[in-house]
């Protein structure tokens, strides 16, 4: 990993996602599904189905079932955890830096009206409010890269997992250390992201923390397809948005989606899925 020209803090990340929370809901997904999709092919443009497929693949790879106690680290608006609890009957906790997204997740949970055993908490994954050896599973989707202290994040995940517990997650990747000015502006600085792991670097870091690697997938085509589809969605949304400030933000995001595709082609941005186990 390399250090960005500007060192963003957790407070910077929290502020960004609090401030942009409603805008993301307005043009991306009203229910807060805001992660990378697992598409069937280059002609597949069904984002919601692809996003659901990502969640289903992680749940299956992680072996989540009705006996699981799941922590969603960086849960955002909460749809993944609610979906897991609804489908599998598992118990769950969601933790996120953004108070706006946690409040939204709580409202979504109340609206689910299904007696789900799920709780959402505002807090940092670098100082989790849970006892050692609590969870059978820790999951996450495209969130942990944003935490500046990645070593502390992984050690906290390791701490709260039970022996034999599973860490199943997807995350953005930084395939190479040197990032162009365009890539830094449109991919990294845009969401207050300092730096990330490469595909192999992520696995090495997990092993160094004490995990055993179970599975890893390098999914470059999936993230490129996601931003192609989301960019098209954003452009369409901007065309029917009257509020000029919001419209300008959405159009800037749509432009960034195109830049993200170029950054992927330059080898500056990637995406992967990882399954790791805490030794029994």
Predicted regions and their residues:
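Short, glycine-/aromatic-enriched active-site segment of Class I SAM-dependent methyltransferases
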Residues: 172-193
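N-terminal auxiliary segments of SAM/dcSAM-dependent transferases
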Residues: 1-27
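A short glycine-rich, Lys/Arg-flanked "PGG" loop and its adjoining helix->strand segment in the class I
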Residues: 151-166
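A short SAM/SAH-binding and catalytic strip from SAM-dependent methyltransferases
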Residues: 137-148
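Conserved alpha-helix/loop element of class I SAM-dependent methyltransferases that forms part
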Residues: 34-40, 45-66
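Substrate-binding/catalytic lobe of Class I Rossmann-like enzymes that use SAM or dcSAM, i.e.
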Residues: 187-245, 251-271, 279-280
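Class I SAM-dependent methyltransferase SAM/SAH-binding core
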Residues: 69-73, 77-127
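A short acidic, Gly/Pro-enriched loop at the edge of an enzyme's catalytic core
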Residues: 126-137
């Amino acid at each position: 990993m390399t250090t960005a020209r500007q060192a963003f803090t957790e407070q910077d990340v929290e502020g960004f996602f609090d401030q942009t929370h409603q805008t993301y809901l307005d043009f991306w997904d009203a229910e807060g599904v805001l992660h990378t999709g697992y598409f069937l092919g280059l002609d597949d443009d069904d984002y919601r189905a692809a996003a659901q497929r990502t969640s289903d693949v992680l749940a299956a790879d992680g072996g989540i079932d009705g006996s699981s106690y799941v922590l969603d680290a960086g849960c955002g608006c909460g749809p993944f955890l609610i979906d897991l609890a609804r489908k599998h009957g598992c118990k769950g906790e969601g933790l996120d830096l953004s108070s706006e997204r946690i409040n939204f997740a709580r409202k979504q949970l109340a609206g689910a009206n299904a007696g789900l055993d799920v709780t959402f908490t505002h807090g940092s994954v670098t100082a989790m409010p849970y006892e050692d050896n609590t969870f059978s599973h820790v999951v996450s989707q495209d969130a942990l890269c944003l935490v500046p202290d990645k070593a502390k994040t992984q050690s906290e995940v390791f701490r709260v997992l039970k022996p034999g517990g599973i860490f199943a997650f997807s995350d953005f990747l930084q395939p190479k250390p040197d990032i162009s000015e365009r890539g830094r502006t449109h991919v990294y600085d845009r969401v207050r992201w300092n730096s990330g792991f490469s595909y192999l670097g992520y696995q090495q870091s997990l092993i160094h923390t004490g995990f055993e690697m179970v599975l890893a997938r390098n999914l470059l085509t999936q993230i490129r397809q996601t931003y192609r589809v989301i960019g098209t969605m954003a452009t369409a949304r901007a065309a029917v948005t009257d509020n000029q400030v919001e419209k300008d933000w959405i159009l800037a995001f749509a432009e960034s989606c195109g830049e993200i595709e170029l950054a992927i082609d330059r080898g500056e941005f990637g995406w992967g899925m990882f399954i790791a186990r805490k030794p029994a």
